[in-house]
């Protein structure tokens, strides 16, 4: 006999009870999650109204109201930890996601870097902070914030990314805040403006990636001369060609791992550097990772940085490949990540966060049912289940009501016109 599965609605309902939202807002978010997963077309207010009991005006009104996304998604994480589907430790991954957008009236429309196309493209960008379980590599996005096209004088996008990261850290529940091992980002975030604020203001270590030509200096560990003047601090530049002054570590993969504590000139601090070298037939390939915590183990740095890549899964699950001229150049949505058609900043913020929360609820529901084995997750299958369940309930609601022939025909006509666009 097939066991009853845990639905995304059940996952969200339990989290809403502890998130401190008003009862009316809880009811609406549960309804919206159901419609979000059911909707086969574009995720906009008009289509949501076609499948649900509320009008598009109601959806537009709710999209203008603030939602504590960090607290709500943090509750999802804590709830999964209580159910032993996530471990009680994690990292905060930071990354920017490019969102294709056309037109000329959308707020903050500008040129942003698109990793898929390898160049800057006109559209939108969201900075996403994701909770990642480094053991199971399961991601739960905490919040996504739209990057403004124009910033105040003297402020760069790196400053904005750092502000978003710190705002998320300050909103974390104390129980979750104590579990954060580090903030992890790719090589773009290895900048003094970002790292210094995360370490000094956020009080968290940062794990990232460096360029192969990073300016690093060995620390001087020799005896003091006793002569007047400033003591010697450094002992030459770190070389990625000669590892004789590095500590070699045994590693199971087909690579060599070396580590050393050095001074980073660009970051203006001591860091633990880890060089992962893959030998090749012609030349070796080197990856330079680091942590601002000099006591962090090299194996931990590698594990945390590798876990960072799982934060791409919610972006992928919120989209589906769209073939354009024989190549995957653009992406469209399983969860409507770039289908918002509103021109209001508040509605855009609501839409982006709702799309990622829908993916999280779907992923956690399957993780709850597959806890005994590695997670096999398909957002397409989850949407199919949600639609089948929604349509079956509509059919059963007709069968359970005593009707005349005319009433039955009216109900059947209503069922067959579900989601149909007006002619």
Question: Where do the protein language model's features map onto the residues?
Answer:
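Gly/serine-rich nucleotide phosphate-binding loop at the start of the catalytic core
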Residues: 1-65, 69-71
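Active-site-proximal, Lys/Arg-enriched surface segment
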Residues: 35, 63-148, 259-261
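Alpha-helix boundary/capping residues
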Residues: 52-55, 66, 79, 305-308, ...
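Single, function-defining residue in the core of a domain
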Residues: 1-17, 39, 88, 101, ...
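Structural motif
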Residues: 20-29, 116-122, 340-352
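N-terminal short leaders/motifs
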Residues: 35, 40-43, 75-83, 229-238
């Amino acid at each position: 006999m097939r066991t009853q599965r845990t639905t995304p609605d059940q996952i969200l309902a339990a989290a809403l009870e502890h998130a401190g939202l008003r009862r009316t807002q809880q009811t609406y978010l549960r309804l919206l999650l159901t419609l979000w997963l059911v909707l086969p077309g574009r995720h906009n207010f008009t289509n949501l109204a076609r499948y649900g009991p509320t009008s598009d005006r109601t959806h537009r009104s709710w999209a203008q109201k603030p939602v504590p996304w960090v607290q709500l998604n943090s509750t999802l994480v804590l709830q999964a930890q209580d159910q032993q589907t996530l471990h009680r430790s994690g990292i905060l991954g930071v990354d920017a996601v490019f969102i294709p957008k056309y037109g000329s009236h959308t707020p903050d429309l500008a040129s942003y870097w698109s990793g898929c196309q390898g160049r800057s493209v006109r559209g939108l960008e969201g900075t996403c902070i994701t909770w990642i379980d480094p053991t199971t590599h399961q991601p739960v996005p905490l919040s996504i914030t739209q990057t403004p096209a124009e910033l105040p004088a003297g402020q760069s996008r790196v400053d904005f990314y750092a502000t978003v990261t710190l705002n998320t850290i300050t909103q974390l529940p104390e129980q979750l805040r104590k579990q954060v091992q580090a903030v992890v980002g790719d090589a773009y975030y290895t900048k003094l403006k970002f790292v210094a604020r995360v370490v000094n203001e956020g009080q968290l270590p940062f794990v990232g990636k460096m360029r192969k030509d990073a300016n690093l200096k060995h620390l001087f560990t020799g005896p003091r001369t006793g002569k007047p003047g400033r003591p010697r601090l450094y002992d030459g530049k770190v070389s990625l060609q000669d590892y004789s002054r590095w500590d070699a570590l045994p590693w199971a993969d087909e690579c060599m791992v070396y580590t050393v504590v050095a001074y980073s000139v660009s970051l203006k601090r001591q860091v633990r550097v880890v060089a992962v070298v893959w030998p090749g037939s012609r030349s070796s390939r080197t990856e330079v990772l680091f942590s601002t915590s000099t006591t962090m183990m090299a194996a931990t740095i590698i594990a945390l940085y590798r876990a960072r890549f799982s934060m791409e899964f919610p972006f992928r699950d919120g989209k589906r490949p769209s073939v354009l001229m024989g190549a995957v150049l653009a992406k469209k949505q399983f969860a409507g990540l770039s289908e918002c058609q509103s021109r209001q900043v508040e509605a855009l913020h609501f839409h982006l966060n709702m799309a990622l929360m829908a993916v999280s609820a779907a992923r956690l529901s399957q993780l709850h049912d597959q806890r005994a084995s590695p997670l096999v997750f398909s957002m397409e299958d989850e949407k199919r289940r949600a639609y089948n369940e929604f349509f079956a309930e509509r059919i059963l609601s007709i069968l359970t009501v005593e009707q005349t022939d005319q009433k039955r025909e009216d109900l059947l006509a209503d069922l067959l016109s579900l989601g149909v666009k007006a002619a």
